[in-house]
Curated annotation (Swiss-Prot):
This is Complex III assembly factor LYRM7. It is found in: Mitochondrion matrix. Belongs to the complex I LYR family. The modification Phosphoserine is found at S60. Interacts with UQCRFS1. It comes from Pongo abelii. The gene is LYRM7. Assembly factor required for Rieske Fe-S protein UQCRFS1 incorporation into the cytochrome b-c1 (CIII) complex. Functions as a chaperone, binding to this subunit within the mitochondrial matrix and stabilizing it prior to its translocation and insertion into the late CIII dimeric intermediate within the mitochondrial inner membrane. It comes from the Eukaryota. One of its GO terms (biological process) is cellular respiration.
Amino acid sequence: MGQAVKVLQLFKTLHRTRQQVFKNDARALEAARIKINEEFKKNKSETSPKKIEELMKIGSDVELLLRTSVIQGIHTDHNTLKLVPRKDLLVENVPYCDAPTQKQ
């Protein structure tokens, strides 16, 4: 698959993720749209394959971070927020053991 196709896929994926993460928040949706478009336009004339790969890695990391770490909060009352988690954020509660296992 060509590099231009991969860049376009990343661009579309970032916009889809933006729409899911900031659903019903017009201000955040618009700010994210502007930032995504701005960053892609800024690097539009980049020709170095190494630099393009580096930029794509950053874009992929941003998409993953948005999808797995950002939670939406809605103001319900004065000093009160209602958190709206998405399915991507919900993980199983796995027991954690901070003691290392002994090798035998």
